[in-house]
Amino acid sequence: PVEKKWYEKISLRGYTQVRYNRLLETNSLVKCEQCDKSIGENGGIFIRRARLVFSGQVSDNVYFYIQPDFASNAATSGSATGLHFAQIRDAYFDLSLDSLREFRFRIGQSKIPFGYENTQSSQNRLPLDRSDALNSAVPNERDLGVIFYWAPDHVRKLYAKLIHDGLKGTGDYGVVGIGTFNGQTANKAEANNKLH
């Protein structure tokens, strides 16, 4: 068989989540600072997420993943009133150290391996949002940094099977993940010259 060119190994997919919070609302004054801006007064139909994913295994040892979100709130983008700003959620590459990709470094902006719920994709979770405790600890669930993952082949196959069978899965975050991060959350410059 003819080996595929690197650009033939790139895939494109995406998803959108829309919500309306006023249907069962009993108190429009209730707010949630960590949540989306459709909760509370003046909430209506709201595009919670509109994401495209570009990804691919471009060589034996290099995998890339880029995910922009076209439904970001301007409150996290610099303006106080607008909706639906494009913003990078994930932009990283995995550099594998072995042929089975069991040992790898993830370099760039990605999810922080901070608990099971944080590593689950929002398209695979039942609730649209993560718990308030997690949203307070790791806003945006992401940061810029370098993470080392140990992901045995048989465990990665189990994670893939869980998702394929429609069960809750986390994706390919391995068994052990340890890293260093800016500590400022996603799309923010380093603010104190101290890594976390």
Residue ranges and their predicted role:
Residues 3-183, 191-195:
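Outer membrane beta-barrel
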